From Swiss-Prot:
Protein name: UDP-glucose 6-dehydrogenase 2
InterPro entries registered for this protein in UniProt: 6-PGluconate_DH-like_C_sf (IPR008927), NAD(P)-bd_dom_sf (IPR036291), UDP-Glc/GDP-Man (IPR017476), UDP-Glc/GDP-Man_DH_C (IPR014027), UDP-Glc/GDP-Man_DH_C_sf (IPR036220), UDP-Glc/GDP-Man_DH_dimer (IPR014026), UDP-Glc/GDP-Man_DH_N (IPR001732), UDPglc_DH_euk (IPR028356)
Pfam families registered for this protein in UniProt: UDPG_MGDP_dh, UDPG_MGDP_dh_C, UDPG_MGDP_dh_N
GO molecular function, one term: NAD binding
Stated role: Involved in the biosynthesis of UDP-glucuronic acid (UDP-GlcA), providing nucleotide sugars for cell-wall polymers. Required for the formation of cell wall ingrowths on the outer cell walls of nematode-induced syncytia.
GO cellular component: secretory vesicle
Catalytic activity: UDP-alpha-D-glucose + 2 NAD(+) + H2O = UDP-alpha-D-glucuronate + 2 NADH + 3 H(+)
Length: 480
């Protein structure tokens, strides 16, 4: 029986290994992590991450050919294939701070693999890493190997949170990069055989190591670029009276462009897009390509601009002050169908409103109060560095309340900011909400999911990104 071990039981490692175990009953899969609470959660009825369909997959396999353990060294020692799915956060200090990937966890994992291994292994990069990381890892393994042979493969994930299980069951492609040597080709074929249990051969792409590593960064950069492009258009639409939804539809019907990732919003979030683009910028700078680096920086700048523009719109619409006004924030996760708040636009929007002394009442069906308070009290990128959490700010705690009900969150509020496109928000009784709000009552739709005409008929003053402005909003101070 082939044995697979995955180091890292997070958003990538857990679901990916669960699906491999389900689709490959003849393969034994162990997911290991040094975090005892996380592994305990994976072994319980309440998994540590929310992902539609994940519970069912885990329950079918757990205890049969899928195991979760904190005994990292044992399972690495016994494995034929070791996936490494550890954090590669953005550095917060030192050379490349704010841009470069911090490979501390990856290096530690590589040294441990070399130290405990007693047989040849295939080591698979599953985390998103800079180009040429495999070369560095190879050197660490080789210089500490005690004669054991390692083959390094790059097998980046292309999952979208909220649809991760669906993506794993029916991937657009599986990408495997390896050394172009007889040993490298053999290692690629071994991993290919695992995925071939359920993925058609034509959808398994093989490349050299460096192409696979760069492809992941490029894919995320291209997706984020599309979001920033349509968001840049949304600002122009508001200025001219055009409707960004109509513009996006017209553009997306061009078969050369297509309709995906053309929904205007308050901005992109999640653990990958910003981090990977900053990493790409740093790689370009290190390779003497400042013009290319500057090009990709603009994707981040537009995303930051979109969030600040949204905050400015809220403040300017409400008589240029939200001081001591209650603002209901509906949604905090970076997208629907996940509880993940990493780099969610809601953080920057909430911080912007808090700087103007607003009182926030936040509701998200999948995000805990503890998580929200922690996110609002951390500096940028600290979410990915558990050891560097900032002390909670008493001011933030005082100004923020978290509820488990949208109606409670909106009661006596002056305005509502819709920050996540949860389906349940479309079906709320907005007449009831309006009746219990301060007047004039505002809705700021940061996800373009609401029936604007219906809200206006109820009596709301409505702002939706990239849509023609209400007369009220036209009369308010201009938003830069």
């Amino acid at each position: 029986m082939v044995k697979i071990c995955c180091i890292g039981a997070g958003y990538v490692g857990g679901p990916t290994m669960a699906v491999i175990a389900l689709k490959c009953p003849d393969v034994e899969v162990a997911v290991v992590d040094i975090s005892v609470p996380r592994i305990n959660a994976w072994n319980s009825d309440t998994l540590p991450i929310y992902e539609p369909g994940l519970d069912d997959v885990v329950k079918q396999c757990r205890g049969k050919n899928l195991f979760f353990s904190t005994d990292v060294e044992k399972h690495v020692r016994e494995a034929d294939i070791v996936f490494v799915s550890v954090n590669t956060p953005t550095k917060t200090r030192g050379l490349g701070a704010g841009k470069a990937a911090d490979l501390t966890y990856w290096e530690s994992a590589a040294r441990m693999i070399a130290d405990v291994s007693v047989s040849d292994k295939i080591v698979v990069e599953k985390s998103t890493v800079p180009v040429k990381t495999a070369e560095a890892i190879e050197k660490i393994l080789t210089h500490n190997s005690k004669g054991i042979k390692f083959q390094i493969l790059s097998n980046p994930e292309f999952l979208a949170e909220g649809t991760a299980i669906k993506d794993l069951f029916n991937p657009d492609r599986v990408l495997i990069g390896g050394r172009e040597t007889p040993e490298g080709f053999k290692a690629v074929q071994t991993l290919k055989n695992v995925y071939a249990h359920w993925v058609p051969e034509g959808q398994i792409i093989t490349t050299n190591l460096w192409s696979a590593e760069l492809s992941k960064l490029a894919a995320n950069a291209f997706l984020a670029q599309r979001i920033s492009s349509v968001n840049a258009m949304s600002a122009l639409c508001e200025a001219t009276g055009a409707d960004v939804t109509q513009v996006s539809y017209a553009v997306g019907t061009d078969s050369r462009i297509g309709p995906k990732f053309l929904n205007s919003s308050v901005g992109f979030g999640g653990s990958c897009f910003q981090k990977d683009i900053l990493n790409l910028v740093y790689i370009c700078e290190c390779n003497g390509l400042p013009e290319v680096a500057e090009y990709w920086k603009q994707v981040i700048k537009i995303n930051d601009y979109q969030k600040s523009r949204f905050v400015n719109r809220v403040v300017s619409s409400m008589f240029n002050s939200v001081s001591n006004k209650k603002i209901a924030v509906l949604g905090f996760a970076f997208k629907k169908d996940t509880g993940d708040t990493r780099e969610t636009p809601a953080i920057d929007v909430c911080k912007g409103l808090l700087e103007d002394k607003a009182r926030l009442s936040i509701y998200d069906p999948q995000v805990t109060e503890d998580q929200i308070q922690r996110d609002l009290s951390m500096n940028k990128f600290d979410w990915d560095h558990p050891l560097h959490l900032q002390p909670m700010s008493p001011t933030t705690v005082k100004q923020v309340t978290v509820t488990w009900d949208a109606y409670e969150a909106t009661k006596d509020a002056h305005g509502i900011c819709i920050m996540t496109e949860w389906d349940e928000f479309k079906n709320l009784d907005f007449q009831k909400i309006f009746d219990n709000m301060q007047k004039p009552a505002f809705v700021f739709d940061g996800r373009n999911i609401m029936n604007l005409q219906k809200l206006r008929e109820i009596g709301f003053i409505v702002y939706s990104i990239g849509k023609p402005l209400d007369d009220w909003l036209k009369d308010m101070p201009a938003v830069a």
